Swiss-Prot record:
Example GO BP: UMP salvage
Major enzyme class: transferase
Alphabetical list of InterPro entries matching this protein: P-loop_NTPase (IPR027417), PRK/URK (IPR006083), Uridine_kinase (IPR026008), Uridine_kinase-like (IPR000764)
EC number: 2.7.1.48
Name of encoding gene: udk
SUPFAM superfamilies: P-loop containing nucleoside triphosphate hydrolases (SSF52540)
Keywords per UniProt: ATP-binding, Cytoplasm, Kinase, Nucleotide-binding, Transferase
Residues annotated to bind ATP: 14-21
Signal peptide: none
Family: Belongs to the uridine kinase family.
Protein name, entry field: Uridine kinase
Reaction catalyzed: uridine + ATP = UMP + ADP + H(+); cytidine + ATP = CMP + ADP + H(+)
Length: 207
């Protein structure tokens, strides 16, 4: 595209319930809503419509293999080229991709938010700023418990079982190690106002 300026890409990673969405909101406030495109990695779980529902119940959402990495990369590349995308929507009650999609317009800043945002090397190479949101494990668990029971139709028992069997071991194996790729680490999660202020200042000076 003639005269197109490639967007500034920010990766926001961290454990489930660490406060990534709060950090993303701060980025939007800093840049201005119309200037930010947000790719939520939760929407890029693989389509499982060809798998029986009972089998989908055993999906390990906390393993890298659960994601549609080629689609995520292609959508990020489209936004970097100034092309709108139709971001899929994931239905966690049905454990598969919804028939709905949301149009995401290219902005001056693109935020990739997700606990595996810094996992994929090809995605990291496209990022100008990599952020890891750190928070205590008990805080992250409580936030996840509230979210999954209130927003995703889960029972407390199923959330606890999933945390013990999948979330905690997968976090230690795959998410926590990506902290070493971060340019900025925000301790104490998304409620750390001084750290969020520093992140905002850094963004203002680099875009």
């Amino acid at each position: 595209m003639t005269g197109h300026v490639r967007p500034f890409v920010i990766g926001v990673a961290g454990g489930s319930g660490s406060g990534k969405t709060t950090v993303t909101r701060r980025v939007i406030e800093t840049v201005g809503g119309n200037g930010v495109s947000v790719l939520n990695q939760d929407n890029y779980y693989r389509d499982q419509s060809d798998i029986p529902f009972n089998a989908r119940l055993n999906t390990n959402y906390d393993h890298p293999a659960a994601f549609d990495w080629p689609l995520l990369r292609s959508h990020l590349d489209a936004l970097l080229s100034g092309v709108p995308i139709d971001m899929p929507e994931y239905d966690f009650t049905q454990h598969t991709r919804s028939a709905q999609a949301s149009t995401v317009l290219p902005g001056a800043v693109v935020v990739l938010e997700g606990f595996f945002a810094l996992y994929d090397e090809e995605l990291r190479e496209r990022m100008h700023l990599k952020v890891f949101v750190d928070a205590d494990a008990d805080v992250r668990f409580i936030r996840r418990l509230l979210r999954d029971t209130q927003e995703r139709g889960r029972t407390p028992e199923s959330v606890i079982q999933q945390y013990l069997e999948y979330v905690r071991p997968m976090h230690l194996s795959f998410v926590e190690p990506t902290k070493r790729y971060a340019d900025v680490i925000i301790p104490h999660g998304g409620m750390n106002e001084p750290a969020l202020d520093m992140l905002s200042a850094r963004i203002r000076t680099t875009i």
